[in-house]
Structures are given as structure tokens and as C-alpha cells.
Amino acid sequence: MGKIIGIDLGTTNSCVAIMEGNQVKVIENSEGTRTTPSIIAYMDDNEVLVGAPAKRQSVTNPRNTLFAVKRLIGRRFEEKEVQKDIGLMPYAIIKADNGDAWVEAHGEKLAPPQVSAEVLRKMKKTAEDYLGEPVTEAVITVPAYFNDSQRQATKDAGRIAGLEVKRIINEPTAAALAFGLDKAEKGDRKIAVYDLGGGTFDVSIIEIADVDGEMQFEVLSTNGDTFLGGEDFDQRIIDYIIGEFKKEQGVDLSKDVLALQRLKEAAEKAKIELSSSQQTEINLPYITADASGPKHLNLKITRAKLEALVEDLVERTIEPCRIAIKDAGVKVSDIDDVILVGGQTRMPKVQEKVKEFFGKDPRRDVNPDEAVAVGAAIQGQVLSGDRKDVLLLDVTPLSLGIETLGGVMTKMISKNTTIPTKHAQVYSTADDNQSAVTIKVFQGEREMAAGNKLLGEFNLEGIPPSPRGVPQIEVTFDIDANGILHVGAKDKATGKENKITIKANSGLTDAEIDQMIKDAEANAAEDHKLRELADSRNQGDALVHSTKKALTEYGDKLDAGEKEKIEAALKSLEDALKDTSADKATIDAKVEELGQVSQKLGEKMYADMQAQQAGAAGAAGAAEGAAHAGGAQQAADDVVDAEFKEVKKD
């Protein structure tokens, strides 16, 4: 069985990890980095770029470069958070036929799970390149405060990417797994995971206990805000720059899509620099132009200014911490460790606020970018049966219930209930002779159903005519380990029942997902073709260059007919390379043709080289001979005549 990989599908960056024995390996992508920007660019020639290559070209292609799409996943177009993003994003956010928020690139409508699938596919390929074998199964993380629709949409993204999602796991829980299994501290510990990522914020209170040699991770409570993260911090800087530039130059940059993309890049860079410096300079020449000529942007921002700009955003993270502590039934002083997850927690102001609330310094020995992917990989190892010493008890983040008489939200499963769980309750009809009931399923904490998120609805029909209050309809809520809800309703008198897996009254249908899988496979085949074509073009370019060089040096050694043939084949290949519509077969044929006719040129080159080598060897031999002769002469010259006298014998 292949390995189950762990993927942290982030708003800003994504990361993939695997377990090798009991050692974790965070895998570098093809660019050599351990995290990949969650950015997808759709190019004019249908090529799809993912990660750093997409980020690099974003300034010149802002309308077709999609980022922070996770903020839209599983959301309705009408939601106020989506409406807020419409005014901020350089790409188009549109309303799909089913009322969901989708995006648009090159005039094509794309569902957020379809876009996120491109990032997941890159993570899958990264793992496959490292392992040298196909990968088909994954554990994917989501913010703990994601609702049912968002979890389902994330699972859909995995399917589109060609992955069987074995488990959806909450990001803070994954980080706790990574922390708990890496540390030597023994005994029961209560930890708080403060997870402020690119687009979402979560806080979870988790108890780590040693139960008969098995490490048990029990989530006591979770809370958060799925529309608060580093992207919002960046936006505050962008708004500030726009305001200052307008004051100085009288030009409003907020209407200039190209300028906005450059501002986004500069804001992110400035924010990162201000985590380690007290001041940074934003310098963007030629940011725009008007009748008086080009305009340049030059602005200094101090850490104090940034902290003032985002103070309320940092403050917004504290209330969920208070609620989580209260829901867990613990006191702040009971928390043994505070773990920071997500790149935005590197900001000193955030760390200061966390310390102020929890009364202790957060741990610094957890990598905020990689901990979540590591935890997902550990959970993958548990699910594959290779690890038996870990038990994970997660919770549902929001209450679930149905709408009853008067529009009231009747809770079936309360928030922070350990999952998987099942709950059944009997309801009845509101009118005499009512033959059908509509079950409307909601998620949220408001007393009235209308104030909560409608997850889905279905009918139970064929109820025998009876006075109101007589029929007994049993409604069952069943949450699986992924936090995804299955609902059933059964008429106890007739035994008739109806069941649904909540996919929201929006979401993608199975047919749409299957089509997206086919499109993705077709794209993969198309990408392979484009890669092969690029390889052929590169080979052609190299041959043109080497042939021209050889002709310059050895062309005069060829007879006129041979030279003409080579020049004709050379021109034919050059023309094919200039023709953007030329396919691989055409270029390969021209390369082959030039290769054939250039053989004579090659022979001349080798003959010339051999002659040169032979000449060099001969010259070297002659020189050596001369050296020997000279040496002998020198030796003779150096002989000293001895004096001797003849001795005569008697």
C-alpha cells in the first residue's frame, strides 16, 4: 500500500509531509522550497502555473492570477465576507448558477475546489517525485472553524486532484499532534494552539494525555474566525499606501489593477521585514502615470505604524480565545503550553498579545509553517495502521440542528462535541393531515434558524393523514470523523425514511466533480504535450546554434553542394522554430533532417580534430626526441676527465 501523505492546504502557502518510519519528512517542491505559495495562474496558451512561478508573473497578469481562494471555498456569493473580497481582489469573483462564489480567469468560470485542486495536484506531484511512486491517498487539513460546506468543498478539491481524502483534520489539532509527538515532556498537558494563518484564525484547547502507553489528543474546545488572517493585515498596509499616495500625488491607485498587484507584493514584503526591523521603505518606481508624466511611490513605514494599522485585527483574535477557554471548562492558568501556528504569528505584536492573554511566553520550538502538514502526515500514518500509539479525539466546531415551529433552531448536536457522534430525536407534524415534512439543517449558535448557516434540506413524504402532533418522525444526525454530517429522517409508523449527506443546497454535484477530474486529467495530458514540445524546441535551438558555429569554422572544407543542403535544412528548422503553431512532430522531423545532412560537416570536424591531435602528438614526439638528444649532449658535456697513470707490472 502506498503512503498516505499529509497536506496543509493553506490560504497563502501550502506544504506536504510524509512519515518515514517514525521520522517526519517535509518535502521540498521542484523549486527547492518546503512551502509552496497557494497561487494559481492561468496563461494565454492554456498553461496553468502553480506556486512560485505563478507568483512571479502575478504583476503582469493580475486578472488571471488567483490567490487566497481558500477564503471562498464552500461559500455563497451573497455572504458578506465574499462581498467584501469582491472589492479587494484583482481577479473577478462571480455568482455561480447554484449561488456559490466562483472565480473567473480568461472568461472561464471556475469553482474554488477546482482551483484549490491545482495546488493539491502540485503537492501530490511533489510527494511522488520524492517517493518515486504514485500517491493516491492524503490527509488534508482545514481550519477548525470551517463549517460543513467548507469541509465538503475541500474534500471535493482532493477528489478533483486525483486524491482519495482519507481524513479531513483540523489545523490546530494537526499542529498539536506534531508538537505532542516531538516533545519529551511526560504526563498530562493542556495546550492552546493559536493558529493565525493567511486567511483564517483558529484557537483550540487540547489535552494531551498518556493512557496506557498511548498518546491521547483530546480537543476540549475550538473557536475562531474563518475570515481573519494575514491577507487582512496586508490589506491594511495596501489601504494605507493608497491613502498616502492619494494625499501626495492626487492619484487613486485603488482603481489600477496592475498597481494593486504591485502594492500587494510590496505590502507583504514590508510586513515580513517589520517583524525583524523597526522600519522599512516601500519603493515602487513608475507605479502609475498621469498627464504630467510617470509617478513613483516612496514611503517609509515603521513597526509602530503597522501595529497601529492592525491593532483591531490582533484584538479580534482574543475574544475567540476567551470563548474557547470558557467552553473547555478550564482556566487560563491551567494551560501548560501555547503553540503558535501560521506565518502571521511571527509578528511581534501578535506574540505580545498572546503572551498578555495566556500569561506565558508561547513556545518557539514549533515551526509555524510546517507543523500542520507534519500533524497531517502523522494522522496519515495512524490511518494506514503503521502507528498504533496515537488516539485523536476531535470536536465539531459549531452546533448543528434543525428548524422547528416558529423558525426556532433546535440543536441536535452542540458545539465542541467529540466526533464521530450520532444523535437521534423524535419530532412531529405542525398541522393536521400533514403528509410531508421538510427537514432544514442548520449550523451555528444563534437561537433563530435564519441567523445560522443553512447546510441543506430534504423532504420526508408519505406520512399517513393524522392530527397534528401524532406522527412520530425520528431525525438522526451522524457526524463522521471528517466532521461531515449525514442526516436521516424516518416515519416510525410506516418505516419510510430519507437520508442525505449534507452537501449544502449549493456545492458541486458528483457530475460536476467528475467533469472537473476529466478536465484535470486532460490538462495533465496537455501539460505533458507542452513539455515535450518545449523539449523538442530546445533541442532544435541547440542544434541550430551548434550547426551555425560549425559552418563558420569548417564550412570552407565542404563542397558547395553539401554546404547548400545544410544551409537549406538549417533555414527549414529555423522557420519551424519561429512558427508558434508548429507541433512536436514537425520540429522533430526538421531536427532529424538537419542531423542527417550535417553528418558530412561532423566528419570534417572530427577529421580536422584528429589531424590536429595527430599533429600535436607528432610535434610533442619531435620535441621529446630533441629534448632527449639535448639531454645526452648535455650529459656528455658534463663528463669530467679523470687523471690516471699507467702501472707497469714487473
Swiss-Prot record:
Compositional bias, Low complexity, is annotated for: 611-636
Q: Which domain of life is it from?
A: Bacteria
Task: List modified residues, type Phosphothreonine.
Answer: 200
Q: What induces it?
A: By stress conditions e.g. heat shock.
Q: Name one Pfam family in it.
A: HSP70
Q: Which parts of this chain are annotated as the region Disordered? A: 611-637
A Gene Ontology molecular function term for this protein is: ATP binding
**SUPFAM superfamilies membership:** Actin-like ATPase domain, Heat shock protein 70kD (HSP70), C-terminal subdomain, Heat shock protein 70kD (HSP70), peptide-binding domain
Looking up InterPro entries in the UniProt record yields:
ATPase_NBD (IPR043129), Chaperone_DnaK (IPR012725), Heat_shock_70_CS (IPR018181), HSP70_C_sf (IPR029048), HSP70_peptide-bd_sf (IPR029047), Hsp_70_fam (IPR013126)
Q: Looking at the keywords, is Chaperone present? A: yes
Keyword line: ATP-binding, Chaperone, Nucleotide-binding, Phosphoprotein, Stress response
Indicate the family of this protein.
Belongs to the heat shock protein 70 family.
State what this protein does.
Acts as a chaperone.
Annotated protein name in UniProt: Chaperone protein DnaK
Which source organism does the UniProt entry give?
Burkholderia ambifaria (strain MC40-6)
User: Taxonomic lineage per UniProt?
Assistant: Bacteria, Pseudomonadati, Pseudomonadota, Betaproteobacteria, Burkholderiales
